[in-house]
Swiss-Prot record:
Heterodimer of HisH and HisF. This is Imidazole glycerol phosphate synthase subunit HisH. InterPro entries: Class_I_gatase-like, GATASE, Imidazole-glycPsynth_HisH. The active site is at C84, H202, E204.
Length: 221
């Protein structure tokens, strides 16, 4: 049954393959009313939508397909925030293998196709040369190509601020990069197009900086 979304500040999509509690609690600590659901009517009517995700792109996309949520998400017009794998799912495709339902063990995984960039693995040769392990796990710094004109998602966030990452795949720098980070190579720490935004890091695990970013999202209409 559809919930009355007027009473909720954020609807988190229950993708079936994500640990949703930490994201939910992070918003609730900011005073937000949060609904976690896979109900299509509730998602469509939401004020703001969060797309979380952990695991492989193939498994996550298979779950969205099984729940008949792909076209619905593609057509959303309210602010939408993808977190970690949720960010990667907003792109054209991921080169990450895994997910038999979409035959992603042998082929690139088709994603939601909303933000025109592609996901590939962090450069293992570069990481090895610099003595850096894969996955990229831990705190790292955000930078902005134009610090005087940051995206509203990063209002009040200073260049050089630390956020928490856990990932092996990344979006390259592009015209859709909102913030970047360096780990063996420069990559997109956040991407966006129109009402869709995604962050590769975990704002719910990124202390005060993460809370600022989630708070900025709550202000978006």
């Amino acid at each position: 049954m559809s919930a009355n979304t007027d009473e909720f500040d954020v609807v988190i999509i229950d993708t079936g393959c994500a640990n949703l509690s930490s994201v939910r609690f992070a918003f609730e600590r900011l005073g937000a009313n949060v609904l976690v659901t896979d109900d299509k009517a509730s998602i469509k009517a939401a004020k703001r939508v969060v797309l979380p995700g952990v695991g492989s792109a193939g498994a996550a996309m298979a779950s969205l397909t099984e729940k008949a949520l792909v076209e619905l998400i593609q057509g959303l017009t309210q602010p939408v925030l993808g977190v970690c794998l949720g960010m990667q799912m907003l792109t054209l495709l991921s080169k990450e293998r895994g997910g038999q339902a979409l035959d992603c063990q042998a082929h690139d995984c088709k994603c939601l196709g909303i933000i025109p960039t592609e996901i590939d693995e962090l450069n293992s040769q570069t990481l090895k040369a610099e003595g850096l392990p894969l996955p990229h796990m831990g705190w790292n710094q955000l930078t902005f190509s134009n610090p005087s004109q940051v995206h509203p998602l990063f209002a009040g966030v200073e260049a050089g601020s630390y956020v928490y990452f856990v990932h092996s795949y990344r979006a390259p720098l592009s015209d859709y990069t909102l913030a970047q980070c360096r780990y063996g190579e420069d990559f997109s720490a956040a991407i966006g197009k129109d009402n869709f935004m995604g962050v590769q890091f975990h704002p719910e695990k990124s202390a005060a900086v993460g809370a600022q970013i989630l708070g900025n999202f709550l202000k978006m209409q």
